């Protein structure tokens, strides 16, 4: 049965860390509004934004333990800095170079925020020999601004066609970023992964030059196929 989540809010007198959310924007809803910082950054006017993905990511950051039914964090919550660097793709085309510059501008203007989450990237597999321009740009942004980017390893759908997993996506080959892969924390009747094994959709290493990527893993759900239909657990 679906998990019922109770909206929470910051408690007066407690100091919470701030995480910058480099994404599509964060919606004003009862679960997230109280955690959003008063200031924000955007590369696009509201009519060219769709905050669905950014809100989904923010919800996992803010309510991860509650959604997973686990207790893995010491933090009761974090403030969310909304950095909308990616548009509604049905209304506006964006290229990697544009995205990099939006990320750079958001970070440079807000250097007081030291931890940033980036769950956007490309679907292009990284090279075994050469680092991508995207990955190197993320390294440069972190070096110049003394910040840390938490980066998703990337997802792939190869499991739906019984194909091997893709390796990490370009941008997840950033050396400086902490790249996060996904583990299954539960197993439904049609799911492919065993509990505590890599999620069927998560990408794997190594990175260029045999560097270890992803750096860490965390629970992100499970999936499988049933008569040609995608089945998901905990996503």
What residue spans do the PLM features occupy?
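Acidic-leg catalytic submotif of subtilisin-like serine proteases
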Residues: 4-45, 60-61, 216
